[in-house]
């Protein structure tokens, strides 16, 4: 038989359908129906949402992100219960930096088959949306039979009044930088972590905090913005660490000097640096080192801002000051 001759499925007794090819449509439909019990709006061809009232010139702000190789830790631990919250956090924390309130979230999950792990991921996504105060408007769960591992992406849209957009233009020399505590690694630097795991330098059983979900800063940011208009800039500390993310909220001609001794770096980062023999500057460029989000405020609002942040249950420190670039 030539390589391009068709197989005789009838002779072999094969009735080819999607399930035989590896995609179970019925299981997928059942999965969607279960999701509808907690998120009634999903399942249509497109999600719809009404623009909230009270805006004169509403601006929509959108962002997309993923969780990177943190998914590999989920596989090692066989625990997918928190990674959905990470996905929401990575998107929401970006969108709120300009002062936007999260409005809705969409997800994309690619999997070999719809199983309990996918259900756990979705539960985490719904929990993340609840914390962020946004609607889960829809998404796509794609079955790829030849795919070995899971992959996922998230998409978030927020809304802000045009005149209240925070773009860093109000930042001036002498303004202070407040660092908000992270819950751990969040969702960055896991390629180094996975390398250390494969080289048996660290073990997940000794460090379950590797799966601690990323902090969602939307509630505390909303509180700060509701309290007044003195938040001049905000930055989500992700890949690139403070050195590459904090400057993104500063106007041209200004820089921030950060005191890395202003807070205590969590032990997990010290362990990674020690076991991997990672250079100190590389640690700063890869990991958040305990600071997951930054806000820039005038010096006379420093203490008030920090009091509000702590009142919301998040620790914080004055970690830097704004100067003119030399």
Task: Describe the residue ranges of each PLM region.
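Glycine-rich, charged/polar anion/phosphate-binding loops
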Residues: 44-47, 138-143, 160-166, 217-221, ...
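Glycine-rich phosphate-binding segment of PLP-dependent enzymes
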Residues: 55, 197-198
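N-terminal glycine-rich phosphate/pyrophosphate-binding loops that anchor nucleotide-derived ligands
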Residues: 3-96, 133-137, 172, 177, ...
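Short loop/turn motifs at secondary-structure junctions
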Residues: 99-101, 192, 230, 315
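Short, flexible active-site-proximal loops enriched in glycine and acidic residues
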Residues: 93-105, 282
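Glycine-rich anion-binding loops of enzyme active sites
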Residues: 49-54, 59, 67-68, 86-87, ...
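Glycine-/charge-enriched secondary-structure boundary and capping motifs
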Residues: 2-9, 13-20, 31, 117-135, ...
């Amino acid at each position: 038989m030539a390589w391009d001759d068709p197989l005789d499925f009838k002779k072999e007794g094969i009735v080819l359908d999607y399930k035989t090819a590896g995609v179970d449509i019925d299981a997928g439909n059942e999965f969607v129906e279960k999701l509808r019990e907690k998120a009634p709006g999903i399942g249509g061809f497109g999600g719809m949402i009404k623009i909230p009232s009270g805006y004169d010139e509403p601006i929509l702000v959108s962002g997309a992100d993923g969780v990177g190789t943190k998914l590999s830790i989920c596989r090692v631990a066989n625990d997918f219960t928190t990674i959905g919250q990470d996905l929401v956090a990575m998107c929401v924390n970006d969108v709120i930096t300009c002062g936007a309130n999260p409005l809705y979230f969409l997800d994309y999950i690619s999997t070999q088959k719809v199983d309990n792990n996918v259900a756990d991921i979705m539960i985490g996504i719904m929990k993340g949306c609840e914390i962020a105060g946004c609607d889960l408007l829809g998404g796509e769960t794609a079955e790829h039979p030849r795919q070995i591992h899971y992959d996922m992406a998230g998409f978030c849209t927020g809304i802000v009044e045009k005149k209240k957009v925070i773009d860093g233009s109000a930042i001036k020399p002498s303004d202070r930088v407040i660092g908000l505590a992270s819950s751990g690694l969040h969702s960055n630097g896991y390629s180094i972590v996975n390398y250390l795991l494969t080289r048996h330098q660290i073990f997940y059983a000794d460090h379950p905090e590797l799966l601690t979900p990323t902090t969602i800063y939307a509630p505390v940011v909303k509180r700060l913005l509701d309290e007044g208009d003195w938040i001049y800039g905000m930055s989500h500390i992700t890949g690139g660490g403070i050195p590459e993310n904090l400057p993104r909220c500063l106007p041209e001609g200004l820089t921030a000097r950060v005191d890395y001794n202003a807070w205590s770096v969590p032990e997990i980062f010290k362990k990674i640096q020690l076991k991997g023999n990672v250079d100190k500057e590389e640690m700063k460029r890869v990991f958040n080192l305990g600071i997951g989000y930054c806000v820039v405020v005038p010096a006379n609002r420093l203490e008030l801002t920090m009091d509000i942040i702590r009142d919301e249950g998040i620790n914080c420190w004055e970690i830097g000051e704004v100067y003119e670039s030399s």
